Amino acid sequence: MKRFAASTVAIVALAMASMTALAAPRTAEEIVGDYQAVANPQLDRSKTEDQAYVKQYMSERQAAELKRAALAKELFELDKGHAMLPAQMTARWRVMATGADSATVKDEIAAVIKVGGPEPLVVAARSANTMLAFRRMQAGRGTFDDAKAAVEELVANHPKDPQSPAALAQLASMADDATVRGAVEARLLAEYPDSRAAKFVKGDIRRRDGVGKPFELSFTEAITGQNVSIESLKGKVVVIDFWATWCGPCVAEMPKLKSLYADWKDKGVEFIGVSLDQPEDKGGLTALKAYVTKESLAWPQYYQGNFWDSDFSVSWGVNSIPAVFVVDADGNLHSTDARGKLEEIVPALLARRDAAAKPAN
C-alpha cells in the first residue's frame, strides 16, 4: 500500500511538473524566432492566370500573415521594449485593419498612444493611426479632415521621425482640392526637404506639370548594351512601362502588353520598359535578363538598379507599379496615367501624327 501511494505521489508530482513546464512563458527570443520562421508561400508566376491557384496562394499568404500577427501580439504582451516589436506590430495592424479585426486594431493602437511606452512603439502606433484614417477615408467612412488630424498628431509628437514626412506625402496625395494638396506639399518640402518623401513629392509635382512638355530619357539597354533615347524615337509614339520582375500585377499584365506591341510595332509605336528591380548585387539584373529572355520581350529595357530608390523613377514620383506613361510622336509627354488606357490613347496619337503629316490641300 505504501509503495502504491509513493508511486501515485511520484506520478502526480511528475504531471504537475510537466504542467508547470508547459505553462512557463516563452522568451522573447523564442517568439521572434517563430515569427521569422513564418514564410510567405512562393508565388508561381506561370500560374497567375489560374484563378484557383491564385485563390489558394492568397489564402496561404493570409494564413502566414495572421500567424505572424498573433506572434507579434505575444511579443507585445511580454516585452514592449523589444527592438523588433514596432515593425512587428505595424505589420499586425496593417494585416488586421480591415474586416472583423478592425475594432481590435483600433483599440490596440489607441491604448498604446494613451498609455505611452517606448518611443519607437508609440511612433508606430501613431503612424498606424494615420493608416487607419486613410483607409476609412478611402472606404467613404472618414473625411480628409479626419486623416489630416491623425497626421498632425503624428507630426506634432514625432517631428524628426521618418514616418512624419511619409504621412504628409500620403495626405497630399489624397487631397482632391489642388490648393489643399499644394499647401501640404509645400509644407513637406519646407520642413523635410531632404527626406525620401520629399523626393517623391517633387517627382509627383513634375509628373503633373510635365504633361505636354518634352520628355527626356537616355539609357544603356540592359540586354544589348545599345544606347536608347527618346530623341532618337521622335516620329514614334512611345509607351513607357515602369515595372519589375518581382511585381505580380506587372507580370500579370505582360501578356496584354506583348499583344499590343505585336499589333503596333510596325505602325510607329515603341515600348520601353523601366525596371525597378533590385540592385545588381541582389540579383536584380540577372532576374530582369532571365525574364526578358524567357518571355521574349522585344522592346528595350532600362535597368535602373536601385529598386524603389532608382533615380529616374523617383524623379517622376513613381511610388507604385505598374505605371505607364505615353510620349507622343513629337517627343512630348502625353500621359502619366495610361495604365489600362493604351488602346484608347495610342491609336488617337497615331491618327493625330498621321493627320499632321498629310500635306495641306
Place the predicted regions along the sequence by residue:
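Alpha-helical repeat scaffolds
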Residues: 71-75, 103-116, 142-155, 180-190, ...
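A short beta-strand-turn-helix
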Residues: 219-238, 261-264
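N-proximal helix/coil linker or "cap" segments that precede and/or mark the start of modular domains
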Residues: 173-220, 231-234, 281, 286-293, ...
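Short solvent-exposed coil/turn linkers within tandem alpha-helical repeat scaffolds
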Residues: 77-88, 98-103, 112-128, 137-142, ...
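Thiol-/selenol-based redox modules, centered on thioredoxin-like
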Residues: 326-361
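Short, internal strand/loop/helix patches
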Residues: 222, 286-329
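Conserved redox-active cysteine motifs that mediate thiol-disulfide chemistry
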Residues: 234, 242-259, 276-280
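N-terminal leader/linker segments that initiate helical-solenoid repeat arrays
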Residues: 23-73, 81-87
